[in-house]
A protein has these predicted regions:
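Short hydrophobic/aromatic beta-strand micro-patches
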Residues: 46-50
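Catalytic core of pol beta-like nucleotidyltransferases
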Residues: 1-25, 33-35, 39, 52-100
Length: 100
């Protein structure tokens, strides 16, 4: 199944799950956001760690969240943290990202 098809109707649940882990501003980017995804593509998501949660969200939390999201939508999920991203990469992503 294409990621763009897998998330159809699940956007609210995806957003709530990401926010339950303490992240804010969840966004979709990559091939699913551009509409050129295919079966076998992963789902690229971007979220921000707010200042109040700095140092409280671990890599284990991120991995666990990715697993929960994958179970929810049935396709591989790659969650990127905006705070840790180089500026040039974030600017590139911002051109195609879609708010969930």
């Amino acid at each position: 199944m294409k990621p763009s098809d897998a998330i159809r109707g699940e956007e609210g649940g995806i957003r709530r799950l990401i926010e339950a882990y303490g992240f804010i501003e969840p966004k979709l980017f990559g091939s699913a956001a551009r509409g050129d995804d295919h079966e076998g593509s992963d789902l690229d998501l971007l979220a921000t760690i707010p200042p109040t949660m700095a140092g409280k969200i671990s890599l284990f939390d991120i991995a666990e969240l990715e697993e929960e999201l994958q179970a929810m939508v049935g396709v591989p999920v790659d969650l990127h943290v905006c705070n840790n991203m180089p500026e040039h990469l974030r600017q590139s992503i911002e051109r195609e990202m879609v708010t969930l």
